[in-house]
Amino acid sequence: MPRLEQIALAEAHGRILDVGAGSGCHSLALMKMGKDSLAIDISPLSVQVMLERGVPARQVNFYDPGFEEKFDTVLMLMNGTGIIGNLDNIGRFFDRLKSVLAPGGCVLMDSSDLRYLFEEEDGSIMIDLADEYYGQVDFQMQYKEDLGDTFDWLYLDFNTLAYYAEENGFKA
C-alpha cells in the first residue's frame, strides 16, 4: 500500500466511512488496526467481495440522501475526488460531506494532478484555459466486448481543491 494511504489510515479516527471502497483493502487494514469502519460502494459485486472478506459494507451511493449516518472520518482514497464527477458538482459534494460528518470530523482524500499530461518538452505546461478544467475526464469500462456506460470522473490539483474547500467551509 502506498505510503500516503498508510498515513491516511493511521490518521483516520472514530467512526470511519470508506467511500468508493472497491474490494475493501483500506477497510481491511482499518479492521486490523482495530478501527471502526463502514465501507460503501455503488457496485453490488464490490460489496459482495467485501462482505465475503469480512468487511462491514453496504451498497450505497455516497450522494443518496437516505444515507444519513454520521462519521468522524470520511476516507476517500485512490483518487477519491473522482466521485465528484466534474467541477459543476463540487458544491453538492461538499454539502454531502457536511451531512455525513460528525461535529469536528475530517475528510482524508487524495487525487492526482493531471497537469503532467500537458507538459511540453521544455518543461512548460500547455493547458487551454478556455476549455473545461483539465482534470475532468470521461471514463468507460470495458471487459472483452462488454462496454459500460460512460461516467464523469474528477482529478483535482491541490490548489483547485483548496480553493473549493475554502469556498465551502473546509480547509485543505
Segments the model singles out, each with a brief description of its role:
Residues 103-160:
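SAM-dependent methyltransferase
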Residues 23:
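Conserved SAM/SAH-binding loop
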Residues 43-44:
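Conserved SAM/SAH-binding beta-strand->alpha-helix loop
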Residues 91-103:
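A short glycine-rich, Lys/Arg-flanked "PGG" loop and its adjoining helix->strand segment in the class I
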Residues 54-64:
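Conserved SAM-binding strand-loop segment of SAM-dependent methyltransferases
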Residues 1-15:
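Conserved alpha-helix/loop element of class I SAM-dependent methyltransferases that forms part
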Residues 71-91:
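A short SAM/SAH-binding and catalytic strip from SAM-dependent methyltransferases
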